[in-house]
Amino acid sequence: MTVKLGFVVAEFNRDITYMMEIEAREHAGFLDAEVADTIYVPGAYDMPLAIKKLLERGEIDAVVTIGCVIEGATQHDEIVVQHAARKIIDLSLEFGKPVALGISGPGMTRMEATERIDYAKRAVESAVKMVQRLE
């Protein structure tokens, strides 16, 4: 069975999320998974609604989130990631389907974000493994 993935990709820090998305797509192909749909959202905080829309479609087996939250002058980055992660978990449980967290941050610099591009690959791996193990 080919695992059908939905991607939700943040446009904020697009120079980094673009590279994350490319790596995620390549790894999905390596794992013989299909990226059936992709929704682009402004930022990580905006992901839950797009995730829900993908999960409502019966053909999507799992959702992979791709985002990058870089530290700023305030604690805004921590709030964004904490609330996004909490809602992502809630949606996974509500729909009974894996939603993999491919959001790097908070508390990282742009250089650290560049070094963590492989978080997207890890999220794809997690999503595919969870679908296979929950069959």
Curated annotation (Swiss-Prot):
Its EC number is 2.5.1.78. The gene is ribH. 5-amino-6-(D-ribitylamino)uracil binds at residues 12, 44-46, 68-70, 101. Keywords: Riboflavin biosynthesis, Transferase. Gene3D superfamilies: Lumazine/riboflavin synthase. This is 6,7-dimethyl-8-ribityllumazine synthase. Pfam families: DMRL_synthase (PF00885). It catalyses: (2S)-2-hydroxy-3-oxobutyl phosphate + 5-amino-6-(D-ribitylamino)uracil = 6,7-dimethyl-8-(1-D-ribityl)lumazine + phosphate + 2 H2O + H(+). Belongs to the DMRL synthase family. It comes from the Archaea.
